[in-house]
């Protein structure tokens, strides 16, 4: 096989240059420094890194246990533990090397005013884009209500759109009746991109104590178990987003290059990696190599040629 065929993994995402379609997902890499302690790890192996969810005021997070392993993934109920936006902007962001990759903020809140204020603070920071977490299932207020109500989702997006010129990425919840309607409303409200899916709500039980494993009772299920659901949702949302030129980050259970390729073919422009980092902190170079090999094998010059290339049965 001729391996001299030039290929590119670069992606133009909302006007931002991603050197690869891989995106490290919020909550899995701390504030961009967590995995830099691992020998061989580099943020440069990802097109973007989405920082840990940030709220207006500091949050202590949920009581333990916060994580539970499942047969094909994991449950987490961290509860958005973070030091608050003031500390993130003033103390944490200055420590990041913004030449490594595109660092994006992740904004959470219990009220629309919370979302607006945190977005406003990040607008005056060096982050490349802002992701709105309106779909977090780990807390008892805020995220679930916003993410599962298309009208409320649109109100959050519109309010944040009014206070930032940076690209807005809206993270969609799979725990709703019609994700396409939410996608449509968020696009109309001013979202530049959509990321999906967030975790699905689930629980685990300790049969000896007959108590929930998680201190919060319920948590977000991630990992390979949700990949088939995520792929379907990405395909459905892509049908809504494509006519408007809206970019998509597809995510949910990516562990192999084949997984990443499926999301691209389903309609994603970029592919999120989260739980896969726990299996293998050095997963990104392997995914990049696998995607590049696929492009070589199929004589494609750019990874962008894969986006939305799904061939449906007639």
Question: What annotation goes with each model-predicted range?
Answer:
Residues 58-62, 204-206, 281-284:
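Short, charged, surface-exposed secondary-structure boundary motifs
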Residues 1-103, 109:
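N-terminal capping/small domains of soluble enzymes
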Residues 1-5, 221-246, 255-314:
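Alpha/beta catalytic cores of nucleotide-metabolism and tRNA/nucleoside-modifying enzymes
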Residues 43, 110-249, 255-262, 266-268:
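Alpha/beta enzyme core
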Residues 52-54, 134, 198-199, 275-276:
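Short secondary-structure boundary segments
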Residues 26, 107, 134, 172, ...:
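Short glycine-centered, acidic/aromatic-flanked micro-motifs in structured strand/loop junctions
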Residues 27-28, 252-254:
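Active-site metal-binding loops of divalent metal-dependent hydrolases
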């Amino acid at each position: 096989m001729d391996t001299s065929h030039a290929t590119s993994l670069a992606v133009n995402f909302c006007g931002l240059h991603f050197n690869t379609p891989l995106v490290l997902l919020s909550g899995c890499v701390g504030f961009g420094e967590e995995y830099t302690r691992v020998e061989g790890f580099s943020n440069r192996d990802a097109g973007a890194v989405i920082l840990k969810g940030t709220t207006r005021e500091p949050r202590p997070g949920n009581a333990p246990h916060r994580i539970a392993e499942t047969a094909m993934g994991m449950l987490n109920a961290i509860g958005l533990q973070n030091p608050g936006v003031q500390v993130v902007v003033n103390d944490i962001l200055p420590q990041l090397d913004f030449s490594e990759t595109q660092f994006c903020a992740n904004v959470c809140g219990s009220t629309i005013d919370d979302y607006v204020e945190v977005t406003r603070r990040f607008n005056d920071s060096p982050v490349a884009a802002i992701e709105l977490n309106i779909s977090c299932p780990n807390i008892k207020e805020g995220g679930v209500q916003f993410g599962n109500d298309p009208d409320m989702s649109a109100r959050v997006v519109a309010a944040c759109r009014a206070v930032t010129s940076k690209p807005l990425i809206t993270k969609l919840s799979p725990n709703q009746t019609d994700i396409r309607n939410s996608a449509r409303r968020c696009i109309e409200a001013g979202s530049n991109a959509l990321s999906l899916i967030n975790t699905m709500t689930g629980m685990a039980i300790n049969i000896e104590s007959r108590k929930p494993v998680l201190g919060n009772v319920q948590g977000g299920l991630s990992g390979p178990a949700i990949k088939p659901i995520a792929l379907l949702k990405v395909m459905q949302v892509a049908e809504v987003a494509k006519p408007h030129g809206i970019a998509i980050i597809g995510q949910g259970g990516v562990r192999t290059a084949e997984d990443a390729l499926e999301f691209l073919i389903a309609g994603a422009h970029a592919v999120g990696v989260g739980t896969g980092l726990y299996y293998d902190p050095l997963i990104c170079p392997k995914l990049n190599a696998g995607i590049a090999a696929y492009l070589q094998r199929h004589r494609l010059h750019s990874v962008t040629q894969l986006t939305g290339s799904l061939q449906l049965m007639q």
